[in-house]
Amino acid sequence: AASDVYKRQIFNKVTEELRRLGCEVKVYAEKDFVEQGVKGDIIFDMARDKATIARLKSLEDGGALVINSAYGIDNCVRRPMTELLIKRGVPHPQSFIISTADEYSENCYPCWVKRGDSHAMVKEDVAYATCKEEVENILADFRNRDIPVAVINEHLQGDLVKFYGVHGTDFFYWFYPSPCSHSKFGLEKINGIAKGIPFSVEELKIQSDKAAEALNVPIYGGDCVISADGTLRIIDFNDWPSFARCREEAGGKIAECIYKRAKKQMK
């Protein structure tokens, strides 16, 4: 997939930048990392596989510095992400967490029904609904696929903005996704082409950094909706995205973030 190519490119770029800073970097495929029982004091990763994440957690528990933390990666699963962002006061749509076996009784339409137990893996894991019947159909599909929990977000009108950031650095990049560019879940189609509603980029960076702290993912990306009055609300947050449009600049800043944290760890 194109996104895998982009992810490999940013990972390679960070490796290159860390070597330029004088670090010795060894790169492993996830499978080899787990099977060979690789150890390390400082590890950076773009892990997705459950076995890798479990292995990283055990290394973290033993004192290793892992960026992004395997615990942080798990925090980006829809349900814990929603709970942690709301708890930390990060601006977020009205949300409900329900068992897929239960009836949805809130009167919140239109809305997005999202798989709650993992990252979205297929487009059916996030669906738009305008009435109770549509929500019930989506929940039935989740049940059929053994998905136990759903997160329901109110649909927000406004401009969809995507962003990338690196906590602890001045790096922050945002853009309007075009309706045709690797549309994530069709929100672009429903919200239409961005109108360019003015908003505070500084405020978006502050809230994004706050979300990164709440979730424990210093290298992050996400989506937010800017309402007509300029209010911003974060609707999605990801650990270590592809940084597809700003790879050159981001690579150096991610390396700087890892390097700074590594030096602190070694004191």
Name every feature range the model reports, one short phrase each.
Residues 60-63, 71-160, 202:
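Active-site nucleotide/adenylate-binding loops and adjacent lid/helix of ATP-dependent enzymes
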Residues 128-215:
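Phosphate-binding site of ATP-dependent enzymes
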